[in-house]
């Protein structure tokens, strides 16, 4: 009998009887007990499946090869008696006469480079006190996300992190680090605690393929948006990638250390595609887990060669199982979906519902990029900005409208935004402040659906963007007083807006990548956090620190109630100034009965009229901590410095 063509597989997988016959709700992957381990693999199109066992994760002798037995719903299984912790294995799956060696799609541990799966007793990977680790209790007004790569966080020798831990999970556990070990200027975890961000978003930490874990890392670098094993931590971030249990333990230690500091952990998840099509999912059930064009070839909405078919029942189940695994076994506090527009809205809502079913699960954040990376075969009900109304109100989106309004478009280096004086952009600033709840452009179910930001790992850093707009040939390492003022203004806008504030690590100390807009595989030196800049630009760091604390002191800005932005009172001001007042909610613990905020994106001082009453100056264009002590009281009129956000509190 002739082998099926890719188009024939597509027809089969889009046939409802196939799903009815083969949908499976029982356990999959390795089920470990001290007395033995059961391996279960969903492979409904397979003619035969065998497992090969190894003592090591790479090389070494074969311990044996055994056949699996096919059961109901296309599930193959085998019982391996005796102690199996630390045993490595691969499957050989035969489909249409072609046999492919593969790892287990449900594996929780792996050998070097993730080629061989590993049976693991998770209890043995728990760091000391893990059973007492709990998610930090973070109020909505305290929420702010700081995005960083594990590698970038501590790669810089100036970080004060011990050499063996630089660029590793364990760097997050080292206490008391300072710049060059000077004992004065905090770095890494010590720095984060002082800054006041309450969530760290980690760029991909599940096992990816673009870094060879068996080789030194000095010249290797990649962000990691090229996953291989979705339920296994990345090995290059561990101190020993050859031992499968080490990466699990050290990843958990990192999370526990952040929790102990009162900081939640958001995981950047990239289920939308895999690094290559020869991966455990496609090797096990060819073509099932990935969308296909009419001719059966792989659809490429990710721009990376394939895209995950979240709408297919067992693919959706895999997605939900994996998310729940990380939430339960790693105590993850939030999930950021890369290219969320490549998922169907029903699947994303199902993920939200599954998280909500966990103890404390309603506090787990869920947001993503509401766009795609190319033309997709998912033509309706995408989890994108156009379908925001279809998403659960606690599924958020990165708001490029806010980003581009504040700092300018991200694809044209020289296109200005509001802070650089773009004409007419002030109209969109009002929309951004209200998290677009008072606009017909989106609108969201609730302000908390909007991730307000001006920089992330993609595109230019904020500092580089500001300099590109100002100069035809920027000097990215030069100090620029106007760009610094514009940086403060940008922060002053999104940190006083409704929604979830988000920032790229180092935005608060003028991080530069010297004009490189896509550094996903640039040098470690270019991508690392330059901790010397945190000291050189300490006044900018302090400005962010003060704004974060000020925001937390006025809880209404963090409201998840869709009606909250309706209380904003915008002033009729001379263009391009923007001003607004927001009353506090009685009894919410706000430090002031109202906030009054003005933005001035011009190069001249401007005078505005204040609402009736007395107003304490809380923050101006250079200091965001005036509210912490005695400050001037204003009535009538006030002057706004050039390129400034000025904040008053009613007294």
Task: Tell where the protein language model's regions lie, with residue ranges.
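C-terminal accessory region downstream of the catalytic core in glycan-modifying enzymes
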Residues: 54, 479, 483, 529, ...
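Conserved, mostly hydrophobic/aromatic
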Residues: 41, 91, 148, 202, ...
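Carbohydrate-binding surface patches
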Residues: 31-47, 569-611
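The feature marks proteins involved in alpha-glucan
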Residues: 1-34, 62-63, 70-174
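Glycan-recognition and catalytic regions of carbohydrate-active enzymes
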Residues: 21-26, 496-516, 528-595
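Substrate-binding/active-site clefts of carbohydrate-active enzymes
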Residues: 151-330, 339-359, 365, 377
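Conserved alpha/beta catalytic core and glycan-binding cleft of carbohydrate-active enzymes
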Residues: 120, 352-353, 358, 362-505, ...
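C-terminal beta-strand-rich structural cap/linker in extracellular carbohydrate-active enzymes
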Residues: 43, 85-89, 630-651
